[in-house]
Amino acid sequence: VKTFFKVTLPMSLSGVANGLLLVFISCLDNFGTVAFLGIPARITVLSTDIYQAIISFSGNSFGEAAAESVSLGVIGVLAALLRWQVAKMFQTMQTDLEDMSPRFFLRRKKLLVESLMWLVIFIINFVPMLTLIVTAFMKGIGGGYGLDNMTLENFAFVFSNAKSFNAIKNSIFLGITTALICVVLGTIVAYLMVRRPSVLIRVVEGIISVPYSIPGIILGLALILTWARPLPIINRTIYATVFMLLVSYVVRFTSLQIRNSTTGVLQTDVSMEEAAEICGASGFKKWSSVIIPLIFPATISGMGLVFLNALTELTTSSLLWSAGSETLGVVIYNYTSAGYTTYACALSTVVCITILALVLLYRGVSAILRHKMGRNG
C-alpha cells in the first residue's frame, strides 16, 4: 500500500488527471444523452438550454444562446488548458517502458472482485443494449415481452421510410467524406509538426484543436451565425445543406486525425526519407513509396475514428440539419421526441450492428497489416 501511494500513484497521476479532465470535457459536450433523458424530465444543462433557446426562435433567442455558449466555451477551453498543463507538469515523471504486471494480488478474493466488476459492466452496458434490441422488435412498449408482441415491421419501416433511408445515406456520405478530408489535412499538419516544427505550425495545430475542445453545440451556433448569409462573390450559401454538416464535421474532427497521424510519423525513422532523397526520389515518390506505407496503420486508425464519430454525431447536427440533410442521430432523436420509440430502437439497432461490423473489419484489417509488416520487417 505504501509503495502504491509513494511511487505508483504519483507516477500515474498524469494519466489519472488527464482521464478525469477528459471525462469532464466529454460531459460538457454530451448533448444526446442529456437531450433524451433530461429534456422530457425538464432537467436542463447548458448544452440543452442553448439548443432549446435556438429552436424557440423567440425575439432574442440567438443572443441568449450566444451568451450561454460563451460561458460554456470558456469552461471547455479552461478544462482543455488545464489538461494540457497537467500533462506538461508530470511529463518528467513518466517512464518510457509500459509495465502491465499486477500491483495487488487478491488471491482468493480475485473471483469475487472480478464477478462484481463484470456485474456492474453487465448492468450499465449490456442490459440497456439488450433492452434496446428487444424493444426494436416490439409492436408496442406496453404489450410485454411475449412472442405475440414481436414483429419485424419496425425494421421494414426503417428501411422503407424516406427520412430513415436519407439519414443512412447522408451519414455514410458525411462519414466517408469527412474521413478522407481529415486524413489529408491531419497528416499534412502532423508531418509538419514532427519534421518541420515551427511557431506557425504550432499555432495552426492549436487553432485546429480548439473546435474539438469546445462543446459541439457552440460550434454549431458559431457556424450558423457565420454561414447563414450568402458567400461573397458567388452569392450562394451552404446553410441548410448537407455541406454545412460536412464543414462542421471536418472542423470538429481533424484534431483526431492529427493525433493518430502524429503517432505514425513519430514511429517512422527519418533516415528512411533521407535514403529516398539520396536515391533521387521526388517529393511525390517519397510520399507514395516511403512515408504513406510506413504511417498507413496509424492514419487508417485515425480515419476509422473520424468516420465513427461522424457517423454517430448528434450535438452539432441537431442545430445544422434541415429537410433533406437529416443524419442518423437526428432521425433517431426525432423519432423518440415524436413518441415513435420502437422505430428509434430499430434504427439504433441497425446503427449498432453496423458499427460493430466496422470495428471487427477494422481489427481484422489491422491484424493483417501488422502481420505483413512484421513478416516484411
What are these regions (language model features)?
Residues 2-3, 14, 107-117, 188-223, ...:
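Cytoplasmic-entry segments and transmembrane alpha-helices of multi-pass inner-membrane transporters
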